[in-house]
């Protein structure tokens, strides 16, 4: 989750106005899709755990294999990016080799997943969410304490937030399509969809998560 502190600002700086709004929207679109399709898919496959299982039921074995391969490639790339971020950040703030921290985290994660499975992942996700919220509150508090609102607006405009160029619109549309298409294959979303208590829980979680993701990316992009 370390990307959330730097990526929105980078997108806003290089992509200008449309891009940051597109990036914020792309963070919410997976939850919009889950809100619409999640309850239906979960009802059709009550004992399911992944999107690939649903695809196999509806479209056959070949389609299931294609979805599984794409999901493995995507999740593998995502995992590499996460560990690369961890390694980079720890080497930037300490003298400890980042690769050692990444290995420690990987081994610890594998250990509790092998022992307790998805329930352990769900529990640690909740702890991580509390930590991320606390970190964001600290960052935003420091940010607002050091800058007046008028200064924030001035800096944001100087960074191109109010510049709406054609290339920025094209880039924003590309980001929305690319991120949404990729996140569909994130098995974490579907595991949580299938494990939800009922359709109401899926929709409530989608609304809260979607709004939270959109506002967080937008605020950090402006900052």
Set out the residue ranges of the language-model regions.
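Hydrophobic alpha-helical segments and their helix-loop junctions in multi-pass secondary transporters
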Residues: 76-79, 83, 96-100, 104, ...
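Small-residue-rich segments of transmembrane alpha-helices in multi-pass membrane proteins
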Residues: 1, 56-65, 128-142, 209-215
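Internal alpha-helical transmembrane segments of multi-pass membrane proteins, especially GPCRs
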Residues: 123-126, 173, 204-211
């Amino acid at each position: 989750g370390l990307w959330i502190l730097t990526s929105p600002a980078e997108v806003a700086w290089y992509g200008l106005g449309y891009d940051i709004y597109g990036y914020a929207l792309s963070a919410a679109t997976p939850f919009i899709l889950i809100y619409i399709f999640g309850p239906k898919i979960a009802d059709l496959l009550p004992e399911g755990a992944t999107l690939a299982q649903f695809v196999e039921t509806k479209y056959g074995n070949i389609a299931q294999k294609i979805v599984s391969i794409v999901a493995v490639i995507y999740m593998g790339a995502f995992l590499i990016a996460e560990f690369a971020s961890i390694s980079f950040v720890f080497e930037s703030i300490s003298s400890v080799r980042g690769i050692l921290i990444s290995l420690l985290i990987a081994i610890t994660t594998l250990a509790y997943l092998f022992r307790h499975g998805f329930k352990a992942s769900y529990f640690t996700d909740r702890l991580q969410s509390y930590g991320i919220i606390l970190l964001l509150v600290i960052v935003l508090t420091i940010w607002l304490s050091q800058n007046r609102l008028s200064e924030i607006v001035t800096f944001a405009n100087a960074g191109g937030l109010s510049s709406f160029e054609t290339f920025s619109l094209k880039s924003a549309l590309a980001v929305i399509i690319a991120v949404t298409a990729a996140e569909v294959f994130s098995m974490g979303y579907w595991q949580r969809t299938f494990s939800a208590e009922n359709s109401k829980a899926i929709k409530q979680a989608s609304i809260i998560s979607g709004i939270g993701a959109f506002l967080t990316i937008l605020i950090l992009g402006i900052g």
